[in-house]
């Protein structure tokens, strides 16, 4: 497997994403048609204590996102069994959660990839990333981290989204 990681630029086509859903079936980003954005949240997994509050907040505030025309999917490289475990332990009620992200997919999205350094971590997993993808399939916003901390605060992101939508603000960082 190549260790080359792509750089995903705003205003370009988002990489493909087809992953199994914990609720059944397959999530395909190309099939999504939200009013404004699809929010793709790549999270580390069950072993990550920082992922739990992020996903729980998204789950709790899903209506706020939906009202803004935003669909949300949370994705990790976890197995189905571990994803079921985190879904139950973290008490996620409505957030769509996908699992089985392959290393190649991690790299196509420009995510940092880590190897296990302690018991309880998957052998290979992605570090956090958050993308907003427009209905036309182009990347609008991205936040990619090499460590579990430093994720965008949801309140800050929602404030930005409100402004961007109201002002028809273009994606930046494309040059």
Predicted features and spans:
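Chalcogenol-based redox active-site neighborhoods
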Residues: 1-175
């Amino acid at each position: 497997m190549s260790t080359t990681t792509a750089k995903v630029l705003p205003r370009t086509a988002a990489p493909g994403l087809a992953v199994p859903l914990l609720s059944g079936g397959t999530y395909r980003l190309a099939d999504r048609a939200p009013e404004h954005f699809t929010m793709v949240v790549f999270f580390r997994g069950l072993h990550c204590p920082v992922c739990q509050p992020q996903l729980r907040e998204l789950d709790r505030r899903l209506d706020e996102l939906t009202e803004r025309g935003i669909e949300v999917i949370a994705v990790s490289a976890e197995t189905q069994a571990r994803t079921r475990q985190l879904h139950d332990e973290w008490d996620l009620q409505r957030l769509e959660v996908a699992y089985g992200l392959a290393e190649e997919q991690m790299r196509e999205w420009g995510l940092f990839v880590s190897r296990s350094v302690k018991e309880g971590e998957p052998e290979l997993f992605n570090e956090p990333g958050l993308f907003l993808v427009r209905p036309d399939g182009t990347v609008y916003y991205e936040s990619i981290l090499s460590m579990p901390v430093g994720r965008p605060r949801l309140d800050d992101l929602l404030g930005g989204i409100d402004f961007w939508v109201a002002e028809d603000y273009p994606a930046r960082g494309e040059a």
